[in-house]
UniProtKB/Swiss-Prot annotation:
Residues that hold a ubiquinone according to the record: 201
Keyword entries, A-Z: Electron transport, Heme, Iron, Membrane, Metal-binding, Mitochondrion, Mitochondrion inner membrane, Respiratory chain, Transmembrane, Transmembrane helix, Transport, Ubiquinone
Family to which the UniProt record says this protein belongs: Belongs to the cytochrome b family.
GO cellular component: mitochondrial inner membrane; respiratory chain complex III
Protein name: Cytochrome b
Primary localization: mitochondrion
Function: Component of the ubiquinol-cytochrome c reductase complex (complex III or cytochrome b-c1 complex) that is part of the mitochondrial respiratory chain. The b-c1 complex mediates electron transfer from ubiquinol to cytochrome c. Contributes to the generation of a proton gradient across the mitochondrial membrane that is then used for ATP synthesis.
Organism for this UniProt entry: Ursus thibetanus
Domain of life: Eukaryota
Miscellaneous comment: Heme 1 (or BL or b562) is low-potential and absorbs at about 562 nm, and heme 2 (or BH or b566) is high-potential and absorbs at about 566 nm.
Subunit field text: The cytochrome bc1 complex contains 11 subunits: 3 respiratory subunits (MT-CYB, CYC1 and UQCRFS1), 2 core proteins (UQCRC1 and UQCRC2) and 6 low-molecular weight proteins (UQCRH/QCR6, UQCRB/QCR7, UQCRQ/QCR8, UQCR10/QCR9, UQCR11/QCR10 and a cleavage product of UQCRFS1). This cytochrome bc1 complex then forms a dimer.
Cellular localization per UniProt: Mitochondrion inner membrane
């Protein structure tokens, strides 16, 4: 009798994705982040669901309902902090996952890569709207500043912003609709992640060497299930440490003050995972130019496959490109630091230089390095 996991219509899908899937024999820990992102997403959906049971999306009671969750709901504080810090873990895994794709040339699997970019935008939108929900000072002013960027769009800008707000400022209507979107988007992300996997399994995974691995495949289970389990354990350990020892480490103290439209906080800034994009936005004096740079800072990922000039897929054997890649990482860390600083000398000029360097590395230096390395390999 044939094993049920290979014949049952539903079990067959799971079997072909998680058990009998042929995987390259040499994929490193950098390939763990896909499963970790899946775990983060499930964790966020579950903690979010329990938070939604006690949260009220009304401007007058939203802040109090979050305080009520932390004080009066059984283990409400741990659910709330797991959700807030789970988002940080989600973004750490996302950045690692995208960085791995850039380093090892995984962007050449174009369908998977493009769905990944859509996923990145969707997760960023979800995180932004989630940050508005506690209705603290930074929630309110963050929502005001970021939605206001759309007013830079010529002709329809102002109307568009007021349409999103549901009035003439960020108010009750804005909070209610943000809650509705924040609730539905994770399920859309889940569906997109399934499509992401579907496209990946059409071609199979890339591997660190960048050489096709069809001649050397191993079953996903038990080799990579146990490897993913170790990664999951380490992620849970990191998250638990953060939640139980310093839950407010990555948050903003201003968000413990209820939203007040009459008092602007001295420094409006988003959560840490948006600071690099926020720094790029601020480094351009023109409003529309800043918005375009902000969008393009993420959208640039879509043209990376077109700029691939090297004969080799990954950067494993390309020292010039490796140097540029790590320079890019250092540049992004610099931008993240600048995004959290006030707009004054010397931070303005550092931010502008870091922004120029970011686009220069990706659009100019990396393609040139690929060509140089092709020529060097002829020697």
């Amino acid at each position: 009798m044939t094993n049920i996991r290979k014949t049952h219509p539903l079990a067959k899908i799971i079997n072909n994705s998680l058990i009998d899937l042929p995987a390259p024999s040499n994929i490193s820990a950098w390939w763990n982040f896909g499963s970790l992102l899946g775990m983060c997403l499930i964790l966020q959906i579950l903690t979010g669901l329990f938070l939604a049971m006690h949260y009220t999306s009304d401007a007058t009671t939203a802040f109090s309902s979050v305080a009520h969750i932390c004080r009066d709901v059984h283990y409400g504080w741990i659910i709330r902090y797991m959700h807030a810090n789970g988002a940080s873990m989600f973004f750490i895994c996302l950045f690692m996952h995208v960085g791995r794709g850039l380093y090892y040339g995984s962007y050449l699997l174009s369908e998977t890569w493009n769905i990944g970019i859509i996923l990145l935008f969707t997760v960023m939108a979800t995180a932004f709207m989630g940050y508005v929900l506690p209705w603290g000072q930074m929630s309110f002013w963050g929502a005001t500043v970021i939605t206001n960027l759309l007013s830079a769009i010529p002709y329809i800008g102002t109307d568009l912003v007021e349409w999103i707000w549901g009035g003439f400022s960020v108010d009750k209507a804005t909070l209610t609709r943000f809650f509705a979107f924040h609730f539905i988007l994770p399920f859309i992300i889940l569906a997109l992640a399934a499509v992401h996997l579907l496209f990946l399994h059409e071609t199979g995974s890339n591997n660190p060497s960048g050489i096709p691995s069809d001649s050397d495949k191993i079953p996903f289970h038990p080799y990579y299930t146990i490897k993913d389990a170790l990664g999951a354990l380490l992620l849970i350990l990191a998250l638990a440490t953060l939640v139980l020892f310093s839950p407010d480490l990555l948050g903003d103290p201003d968000n413990y003050t209820p939203a007040n439209p009459l008092s602007t906080p001295p420094h409006i800034k988003p959560e840490w995972y948006f600071l690099f994009a926020y720094a790029i936005l601020r480094s351009i004096p023109n409003k529309l130019g800043g918005v375009l740079a902000l969008i393009f800072s993420i959208l640039i990922l879509a043209i990376i496959p077109l700029l691939h000039t090297s004969k080799q897929r990954g950067m494993m054997f390309r020292p010039l490109s490796q140097c540029l890649f790590w320079l890019l990482v250092a540049d992004l860390l610099t931008l993240t630091w600048i995004g959290g600083q006030p707009v004054e000398h010397p931070f303005i000029i550092i931010g502008q230089l870091a922004s120029i360097l970011y686009f220069t590395i990706l659009l100019v230096l990396m393609p040139i390095a690929g060509i140089i390395e092709n020529n060097l390999s002829k020697w």
